[in-house]
Amino acid sequence: MKTTCNLRTRRAILSLAAAMAILPLGASAAEAQLLNVSYDVARELYKEINPAFIAEWKKNTGETITINQSHGGSSKQARSVADGLEASVVTMNQANDIDMLADRGVVAAGWAKKFPHNAAPFYSTMIFLVRKGNPKQIKTWDDLAKPGTKVVIPNPKTAGNGRYTYLAAWGSVIKKGGTEAQARELVARIFKNVPVLDGGGRAATTTFTQRDIGDALVTFESEVQMVRSEFGGNFEVVYPAVSILAESPVAVVDKVVDKRGVRKQATAYLNFLYSDAGQTIGAKHFLRPRSETVAKKFAGNYKPIALFTVDEVFGGWKQAQKKHFDDGGEFDKIYQVK
């Protein structure tokens, strides 16, 4: 019996030693993992941001970290997080989506004060992409409303850039002294020209560039410039005289990071977006950086354009959401008429 017990003990020890040998030296049983739930056209940005942060974190702390990405229409993504998708951080394209998460108690009520610039490390605006030669001579928001013009815009109910496009068109009328009725009439005529409402910004880009639907695509400046750099001379970029400031806000998802013990890593990840390295990567992807130094370096990427804010014209995102995008709001009335 003693011999049998000794053999069993020795085998158990050898098995344990073999299992330990498989692990790399210094490996942690619970390597930190983050999930970044983000908007549709930010895929390429975070594919470059993530390895840069991982390398810096490893260099500074000696810890290995894994970052996963999830992308879709901004509002749809936010609802997924509200419904239980365990995001460590959210990186959206409108404050309204994160406000909704704050109202649900998923992120802190004061999330916009946790990071600089109202927790928006980058910003963009809404411009037009047209086909080579601009055959429909689309130069202004009013041109998008001309009969016979087809405009590709993602659904404002699910996509942040769809909402920004709607608000930019509406605000373009108000900024030149027009009335609410005139703004509504212009937006209604533009959406009458929309052949299909895609669920997200990248789907809208695919509809325009690969399915050859539409005379103009309205989307973020960063997406327009990306398409131009990828597809070369097939398309042209058009800047309207005025457009909307489109910020890209971020937040830590408090319940998840505390549950998983990764608050430190999640906070550092979002702070990295404000670093020179993070700002430079954003600028390379045609987002407008907050850093003046980086902005000067990439000044050639951006054309000057008059910008107005959601607060300035609509009284803030909560009022804009309630009036225009809630069920039964202005958008529903306009699109049902279509």
What is the predicted function of each stretch?
Residues K176-A241:
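Ligand-binding pocket segment of bilobal, Venus flytrap-like solute-binding proteins
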Residues V257-K338:
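Extracellular/periplasmic juxtamembrane helices and adjacent flexible linkers that interface
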Residues K2-L14, A19:
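Twin-arginine (Tat) signal peptide motif
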Residues E31-A159, A306, Y335-K338:
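N-terminal segment of the mature folded domain
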Residues L25-E31:
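Sec/Tat signal peptide C-region and signal peptidase I cleavage site
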Residues T125-N134, E247-K264, I281-H285:
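A bilobed periplasmic-binding-protein/Venus flytrap-type ligand-binding module shared by bacterial periplasmic
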Residues G133-K139, T158, G171-T179, V256-K264:
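Short helix-loop capping/hinge motifs at secondary-structure junctions, enriched
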Residues V37-Y39, V130-K132, K150-K176, I190-V194, ...:
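Short beta-strand->loop
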